[in-house]
């Protein structure tokens, strides 16, 4: 008989083992090795955002008021992108732009790069946290894989897109109204709504919402009645042996409604994972394309015919004209340093004019 003898528990642990024991200890809020990245980055990203929206103006970078101190509210406050002249500078506090002056750093837009970079690493840390915890309790890593969807969208929009453009100036500022303005910018300058990758993203997000509503309603509709047994539906009892709802009944119901239905829970839940995550990934790929100024679905034949025949118009040609109006108005507003001057006859007029 062979006897396996392990290390004596009395042997002193090295630094790595001691840290591993402390970080991965069972506690109310799991820390883990991923927490070394997640918690500091999330703290600094949120702290920078709250600081910027509360105190810091965007007058020097965008000519705008953007803080509570200046009279903005939650919907209009934002941490704005750096000035266009700063291009892709990391805007480090100790760098050549701010030279250690915190006030100047905030005025130049340093808080935006601070929030964007720490926010990106914080999101990645959160995904790694899901990997680490899943491995610790012997789960498969699909939660982390699903979370890669939002991460890919955030990184592509906030980092990769401005890297492909002239500077951080063209990234979205971090605020509600600021994001809306960025969406209008995407439409006017890239015709984003007609981009097939955006279409796949919309199909993924709205399709996922539909699947979620259908699934939740179906489970509620087919729940088995609670029994009085000690082993029946007691909240989070891990030893429950019965099914919670009737998959057979659900299958028969949707087979009658649609003619087709999911026949097993594995495929059903994988599909609910696949639809939104793939949609988000496709959107992220599309934004990377926009970073390189790739265009999609330019129906030039319709534009030429519309230019030649005043009576010919499609929804596409109307949208193209709308995009031209967005560009004419936004470019002059957003980039006053470019001294863009458009003839009066091409500028869009508001209702008051």
From Swiss-Prot:
A plastoquinone binds at residues 215, 262. It catalyses: 2 a plastoquinone + 4 hnu + 2 H2O = 2 a plastoquinol + O2. The chain crosses the membrane at residues 41-61, 125-141, 153-166, 208-228, 279-295. Its EC number is 1.10.3.9. Fe cation binds at residues 215, 269. Chlorophyll a PD2 binds at residue 198. It is a multi-pass membrane protein. InterPro entries: D1/D2, Photo_II_D1/D2_sf, Photo_RC_L/M, Photo_RC_L/M_CS, PSII_PsbD/D2. One of its GO terms (cellular component) is photosystem II. One of its GO terms (molecular function) is electron transporter, transferring electrons within the cyclic electron transport pathway of photosynthesis activity. It is found in: Plastid, Chloroplast thylakoid membrane. Pheophytin a binds at residues 130, 143. Keywords: Acetylation, Chlorophyll, Chloroplast, Chromophore, Electron transport, Iron, Magnesium, Membrane, Metal-binding, Oxidoreductase, Phosphoprotein, Photosynthesis, Photosystem II, Plastid, Thylakoid, Transmembrane, Transmembrane helix, Transport. The D1/D2 heterodimer binds P680, chlorophylls that are the primary electron donor of PSII, and subsequent electron acceptors. It shares a non-heme iron and each subunit binds pheophytin, quinone, additional chlorophylls, carotenoids and lipids. There is also a Cl(-1) ion associated with D1 and D2, which is required for oxygen evolution. The PSII complex binds additional chlorophylls, carotenoids and specific lipids. Chlorophyll a ChlzD2 binds at residue 118. CDD domains: Photosystem-II_D2. The modification Phosphothreonine is found at residue 2. SUPFAM superfamilies: Bacterial photosystem II reaction centre, L and M subunits. The modification N-acetylthreonine is found at residue 2. GO terms for biological process: photosynthetic electron transport in photosystem II. PSII is composed of 1 copy each of membrane proteins PsbA, PsbB, PsbC, PsbD, PsbE, PsbF, PsbH, PsbI, PsbJ, PsbK, PsbL, PsbM, PsbT, PsbX, PsbY, PsbZ, Psb30/Ycf12, at least 3 peripheral proteins of the oxygen-evolving complex and a large number of cofactors. It forms dimeric complexes. 2 of the reaction center chlorophylls (ChlD1 and ChlD2) are entirely coordinated by water. Photosystem II (PSII) is a light-driven water:plastoquinone oxidoreductase that uses light energy to abstract electrons from H(2)O, generating O(2) and a proton gradient subsequently used for ATP formation. It consists of a core antenna complex that captures photons, and an electron transfer chain that converts photonic excitation into a charge separation. The D1/D2 (PsbA/PsbD) reaction center heterodimer binds P680, the primary electron donor of PSII as well as several subsequent electron acceptors. D2 is needed for assembly of a stable PSII complex. Belongs to the reaction center PufL/M/PsbA/D family. This is Photosystem II D2 protein. The gene is psbD.
């Amino acid at each position: 008989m062979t006897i396996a003898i392990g290390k004596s528990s009395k042997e002193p642990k090295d630094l790595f083992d001691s840290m591993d024991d402390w970080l991965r200890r069972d506690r109310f809020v799991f820390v883990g090795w991923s927490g070394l990245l997640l918690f500091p980055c999330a703290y600094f990203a949120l702290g920078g955002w709250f600081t910027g929206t509360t105190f810091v103006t965007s007058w020097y970078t965008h000519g705008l008021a953007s803080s509570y101190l200046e009279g903005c509210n939650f919907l209009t406050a934002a941490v704005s992108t750096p000035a266009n002249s700063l291009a892709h500078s990391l805007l480090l506090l100790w760098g050549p732009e701010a030279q250690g002056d915190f006030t100047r750093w905030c005025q130049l837009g340093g808080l935006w790069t601070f929030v964007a970079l720490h926010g990106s690493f914080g999101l990645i840390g959160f995904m790694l946290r899901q990997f680490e915890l899943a491995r610790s309790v012997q789960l498969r890593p699909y939660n982390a894989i699903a979370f890669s969807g939002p991460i890919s969208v955030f990184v592509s929009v906030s980092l990769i897109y401005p890297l492909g453009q002239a500077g951080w100036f063209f990234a979205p500022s971090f605020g509600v109204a600021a994001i809306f303005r960025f969406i209008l910018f995407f439409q006017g300058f890239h015709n984003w709504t007609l981009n097939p990758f955006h279409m796949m993203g919309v199909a993924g997000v709205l399709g996922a919402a539909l699947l979620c509503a259908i699934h939740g309603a179906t489970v509620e509709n087919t729940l088995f009645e609670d029994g009085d047994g000690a082993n029946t539906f007691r909240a989070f009892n891990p030893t429950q042996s019965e099914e919670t709802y009737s998959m057979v009944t659900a299958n028969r119901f949707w087979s009658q409604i649609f003619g087709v239905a999911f026949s097993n829970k594995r495929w059903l839940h994988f599909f609910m994972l696949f639809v939104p995550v793939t949609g988000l990934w496709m959107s992220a790929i599309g934004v990377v394309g926009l970073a390189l100024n790739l265009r999609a679905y330019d129906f030039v034949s319709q534009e030429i015919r519309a230019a030649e025949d005043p009576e010919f118009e499609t929804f596409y040609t109307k949208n193209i004209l709308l995009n031209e109006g967005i560009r004419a108005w936004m470019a002059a507003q957003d980039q006053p340093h470019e001294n863009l001057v458009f003839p009066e006859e091409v500028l869009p007029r508001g209702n008051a004019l």
